[in-house]
């Protein structure tokens, strides 16, 4: 969930400067963030629906890998309004789509009695990722005059997150029963 936080904070914090540096009109980042917000709703509902029918770990792997593809598309193709729209739609669809399957895995493995506490603990990793995505994005920009290393790191994190979810055993842990 750390990677989710990294992606979200990096994009939300630095997309205006990134797009300005690429020479896109001033209104383009606002449009991209609005598209992210709109398509986030559809993506989150869709991932929640899919998480009730398919492997949650595979859904999470797909989401993170697709985020990497979306970032690759966005940073390696020529900057344009069209490519910005495609990024806003695709990244928006994937934005918080990690939440339902992540929460589902926690509930499935550990049960629902303490799901609030356990998800709170999981969410701390999201917030650490958010801090680092926003902060290090700025550090990379100050050191290099661009966001290249922040984007490359985001792609690497996408691959890592896509792979790290695959070994998860989606099975409830055995609980000891009191005598």
Please name every model-derived segment:
Residues 153-179:
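Multi-pass alpha-helical transporter architecture, strongest
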Residues 44-55, 141-142:
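Helix-to-loop junctions at the C-terminal end of transmembrane segments
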Residues 139-157:
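A membrane-interface helix-boundary motif in multi-pass transporters
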Residues 66-79:
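C-terminal ends and interior cores of transmembrane alpha-helices
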Residues 53-64:
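Cytoplasmic membrane-interface "Motif A"-like loop-to-helix N-cap segments
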Residues 1-47, 99, 133:
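Extracytoplasmic gate region of multi-pass secondary transporters
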Residues 2, 83-97:
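Hydrophobic core of transmembrane alpha-helices in multi-pass small-molecule transporters
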Residues 97-110:
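Intracellular juxtamembrane helix-capping segments at the cytosolic ends
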């Amino acid at each position: 969930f750390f990677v989710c936080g990294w992606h979200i904070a990096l994009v939300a914090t630095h997309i205006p400067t990134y797009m300005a540096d690429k020479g896109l009109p001033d209104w383009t980042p606002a449009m991209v963030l609005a598209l992210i917000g709109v398509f986030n709703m559809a993506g989150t509902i869709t991932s929640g629906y899919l998480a009730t029918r398919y492997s949650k770990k595979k859904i999470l792997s797909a989401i993170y890998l697709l985020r990497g593809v979306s970032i690759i598309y966005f940073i390696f193709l020529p900057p344009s309004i069209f490519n910005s729209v495609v990024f806003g739609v695709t990244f928006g669809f994937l934005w918080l789509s990690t939440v339902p399957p992540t929460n589902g895995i926690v509930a499935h493995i550990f049960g629902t009695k303490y799901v609030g506490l356990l998800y709170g603990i999981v969410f701390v990793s999201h917030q650490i990722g958010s801090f680092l995505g926003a902060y290090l994005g700025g550090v990379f920009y100050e050191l290099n005059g661009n966001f290249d290393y922040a984007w490359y790191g985001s792609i690497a994190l996408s691959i890592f997150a896509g792979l790290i979810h695959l070994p998860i055993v989606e099975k409830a842990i055995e609980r000891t029963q009191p005598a």
